[in-house]
Amino acid sequence: MAVLKNAKRFKKKFPLTIAWRLKSNSDVVEKHLNPDEEVKYVFVGQKNNRFYDIFSTCVIAITNKRILIGRKRVIFGYMLDSVMPYMYNDLNIKSGFIWGKVTIDTIKEELVFSNIDKAALSEIETNISESMIALKRKYPKSEKDEK
């Protein structure tokens, strides 16, 4: 229930963010939390690159081990993305007139979250950056990186 509580808190704090079905999307993330994982920060948005597509709401949870992105399908099934610290490359924030976008660049793909209240962007950037920096420090560098 920590994910849903934090998602609702985020939505209340930043009401211009477009997000639907917070409970069902939060349940996807809750289902995949490991017993030793704790939720540090949660935000919501649309997992797409288009401001006019408002039907792909997801809940993004930053834990003490990874970033989880949960989306519940309308009829059946769900989708979950997980970003481990070693997969994380970069973070890009774009602010528009009303909404903003957050792009998490990973080794495999770019994850874009849109229709987020632009007032929330600095808070999201701070939480993702600080979490990923702290988590990356825990992973030892490979021999290839040391050369």
Model-found features: residue ranges?
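Acidic, Ser/Thr- and proline-rich intrinsically disordered linker/docking segments
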Residues: M1-L22, S26-N34, Y52-D53, R73-K147
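The phosphoinositide-binding surface of pleckstrin homology
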Residues: E37-Y52
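Soluble periplasmic/extracytoplasmic beta-strand elements of cell-envelope proteins
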Residues: K40-V42, A61-I62, L68, T103
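Small-side-chain structural scaffolding
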Residues: G45, A61-T63, G100, S131
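Conserved beta-hairpin
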Residues: N48-G77
